[in-house]
């Protein structure tokens, strides 16, 4: 068994949800664009109360609009019921480089968000999916324009420019919206 990786070298790729059936299968929420691409990335690590533990996919399939999976470490429904909410991680260095104008969400979290009026709105604290598109949660900081938290869509009409070197995202988003 391999030793647990350094937490700072990990990227969250999904989360285990409620059990499916009686044989230890679980619904899997994938944070990858293609929901099934998560199964092409190995090895997985799960974050537990006692630290990072390996998690090995035994089988998976699409089920309705979601995805379910069975794992070596989860033998039955009783164990599966304790896994709801467990987050799934992979080592960042095994992931392919993103294409031009594509980003891993983990690379966007902590970036400064500035609008076209050159107003600093805050820092990205979270990226999440709504179904229609991704959303940036932008939290105020001590030196941002105001103390407002903003939910800004990650969309080509909203995101003007991303500069990972400068750690900024330029958005077409007025401060009073």
From Swiss-Prot:
GO terms for biological process: ribosomal small subunit biogenesis; rRNA processing. It is found in: Cytoplasm. Residues 100-177 form the PRC barrel domain. Coiled coil: none annotated. GO terms for molecular function: ribosome binding. The keyword Lipid biosynthesis does not apply. InterPro entries: PRC_barrel-like_sf, PRC_RimM, RimM, RimM_N, RimM_N_sf, Transl_B-barrel_sf. GO terms for cellular component: cytoplasm; ribosome. The keyword Transit peptide does not apply. It comes from the Bacteria. Keywords: Chaperone, Cytoplasm, Ribosome biogenesis, rRNA processing. An accessory protein needed during the final step in the assembly of 30S ribosomal subunit, possibly for assembly of the head region. Essential for efficient processing of 16S rRNA. May be needed both before and after RbfA during the maturation of 16S rRNA. It has affinity for free ribosomal 30S subunits but not for 70S ribosomes. The PRC barrel domain binds ribosomal protein uS19. Binds ribosomal protein uS19. Belongs to the RimM family. This is Ribosome maturation factor RimM. It comes from Psychrobacter arcticus (strain DSM 17307 / VKM B-2377 / 273-4). The gene is rimM.
């Amino acid at each position: 068994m391999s030793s647990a990786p350094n937490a700072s070298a990990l990227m969250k790729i999904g989360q285990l949800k409620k059990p499916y059936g009686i044989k230890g299968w679980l619904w899997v929420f994938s944070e990858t664009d293609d929901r099934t691409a998560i199964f092409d990335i190995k090895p997985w690590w799960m974050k537990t109360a006692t630290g990072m533990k390996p998690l090995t996919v035994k089988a998976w399939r699409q089920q309705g609009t979601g995805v379910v999976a069975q794992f070596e470490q989860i033998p039955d429904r009783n164990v599966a019921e304790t896994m709801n909410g467990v987050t799934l991680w992979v080592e960042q260095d095994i992931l392919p480089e993103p294409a031009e104008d594509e980003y891993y969400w983990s690379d966007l979290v902590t970036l400064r968000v500035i609008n076209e009026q050159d107003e600093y709105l805050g820092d990205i604290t979270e990226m999440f999916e709504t179904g229609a598109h991704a959303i940036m949660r932008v939290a105020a900081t001590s030196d941002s324009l105001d103390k407002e938290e903003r939910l800004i869509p990650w969309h080509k009409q909203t995101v003007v420019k991303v500069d990972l070197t400068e750690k900024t995202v330029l958005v077409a988003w007025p401060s009073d919206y």
